């Protein structure tokens, strides 16, 4: 019987794929507007390569961008990028469609809720607080505090311990097959793959670890209804909802 439901944050509860792309493009446009002597396509493609190399949480993307473009350090250009990025991020920050409605219903049904996410703790909490999602969750587990990222078992085991539940009493919902679904299944949790965002067609070799597949968060309620009505001792085969 499922007692606790864990959610990933990015592209599971918060629509970050579209947000990040818009923010990065606006940053480059604002840098050019303030004197960056490079065309948009060149600067943007270099920025994307930097993000691939250093990760999205690297704090010096725009500083390194100038180096890659063989340009001198210019705090005005860097500030223009930072300002446009953050202004866009705050303006476009949105929940995934249906997220709040589903969270409200899950609390009404008596489920305990948690978040298991990778990323910079300050940035992740900023998203949660700006969207006023914090009251839904008893615990928020962020990998940077643990020294490991999903799918490492440590972060999932810590989440289970926080709620004092067995793995079979927990269900993980996430958009990433490798980090969310494989990671949770490896410690014995039930899993729901949410096909959303830029990762919906990636890492398909890990699809077999999903007990259920959904295309919208409202379908999670149907998954839970099936789970609660099932008397089987084994997990049902993967089902598309």
Swiss-Prot record:
Signal peptide extent: none
Alphabetized UniProt keyword annotations: Hydrolase, Magnesium, Metal-binding
Keyword Coiled coil: no
GO biological process annotation, one example: small molecule biosynthetic process
InterPro entries named in the record: HAD-like_hydrolase, HAD-like_sf, HAD-SF_hydro_IA, HAD-SF_hydro_IA_CTE7, HAD-SF_hydro_IIIA, HAD_sf
Listed EC numbers: 3.1.3.-
Cofactor: Mg(2+)
Keyword set includes Magnesium: yes
SUPFAM superfamilies: HAD-like
Any GO MF annotation of the entry: phosphatase activity
Function: Catalyzes the dephosphorylation of D,L-glyceraldehyde 3-phosphate in vitro.
NCBIfam families: CTE7, HAD-SF-IA-v1, HAD-SF-IA-v3, HAD-SF-IIIA
Family: Belongs to the HAD-like hydrolase superfamily.
PANTHER family: GLYCERALDEHYDE 3-PHOSPHATE PHOSPHATASE, N-ACYLNEURAMINATE-9-PHOSPHATASE
Annotated protein name in UniProt: Glyceraldehyde 3-phosphate phosphatase
UniProt source species: Pyrococcus horikoshii (strain ATCC 700860 / DSM 12428 / JCM 9974 / NBRC 100139 / OT-3)
Phylogenetic classification of the source organism: Archaea, Methanobacteriati, Methanobacteriota, Thermococci, Thermococcales
